[in-house]
């Protein structure tokens, strides 16, 4: 009986230590899971377009990160702060060419908003609230997101 309790406790410790690392969501090694998605911070700066292409190559369904709630934003900002110091990070929001609508790089409509100002490609910071825009050609770090 004591051995069964010991083994059960050991399995519980392993499960709890893996929670939040993406293991429970079946994320690839080095990726972190939240709400049915996997996330990874990349610290090699790229232009917005190059970062989006890079994310698409990483996993099936991969794109630059899109935010759909303040809780998801908080999760990603915490993930970034564990990896990088204060940096500009691209996210998947840009002005859809020849349209007046903003859209996420994964095709989702923009519903949740946190604008600080307006322009073409959008970034966020791990230390400043709100979204900001800048020329898409400029380099920035980025976070990729994919379905779990």
UniProtKB/Swiss-Prot annotation:
SUPFAM superfamilies, per database record: C-type lectin-like (SSF56436)
Chief site of localization: secreted
Entry GO MF terms: toxin activity
Disulfide bonds: 27-38, 55-144, 121-136
Domain of life (superkingdom): Eukaryota
N-terminal signal peptide: 1-24
Keyword entries, A-Z: Disulfide bond, Hemostasis impairing toxin, Secreted, Signal, Toxin
Cited PROSITE patterns: C_TYPE_LECTIN_1 (PS00615), C_TYPE_LECTIN_2 (PS50041)
Localization per Swiss-Prot or TrEMBL: Secreted
Domain (C-type lectin) ranges: 34-145
Pfam families the record matches: Lectin_C
GO cellular component: extracellular region
Tissue expression notes: Expressed by the venom gland.
Other observations noted: Shows greater sequence similarity to the beta than alpha subunits compared to other heterodimer snaclecs.
PANTHER family registered for this protein in UniProt: MANNOSE, PHOSPHOLIPASE, LECTIN RECEPTOR RELATED
Functional note: Interferes with one step of hemostasis (modulation of platelet aggregation, or coagulation cascade, for example).
Subunit structure, interactors included: Heterodimer; disulfide-linked.
Recorded family membership: Belongs to the snaclec family.
Protein name: Snaclec B2
């Amino acid at each position: 009986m004591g051995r069964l309790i010991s083994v059960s406790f050991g399995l519980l410790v392993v499960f709890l230590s893996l929670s939040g690392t993406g293991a429970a969501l079946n994320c690839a090694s080095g990726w972190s899971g939240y709400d049915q998605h996997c996330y990874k911070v990349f610290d090699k700066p790229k232009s917005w377009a190059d970062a989006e292409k890079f994310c698409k190559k990483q996993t099936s369904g991969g794109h630059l990160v899109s935010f759909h709630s303040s809780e998801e934003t908080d999760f990603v900002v915490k993930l970034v702060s564990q990896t990088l110091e204060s940096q500009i990070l691209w996210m998947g929001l840009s002005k859809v060419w020849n349209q007046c609508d903003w859209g996420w790089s994964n095709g989702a409509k923009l519903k949740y908003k946190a604008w600080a100002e307006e322009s073409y490609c959008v970034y966020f910071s791990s230390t400043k609230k709100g979204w900001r825009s800048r020329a898409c050609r400029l380099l920035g770090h980025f976070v990729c997101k994919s379905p779990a």
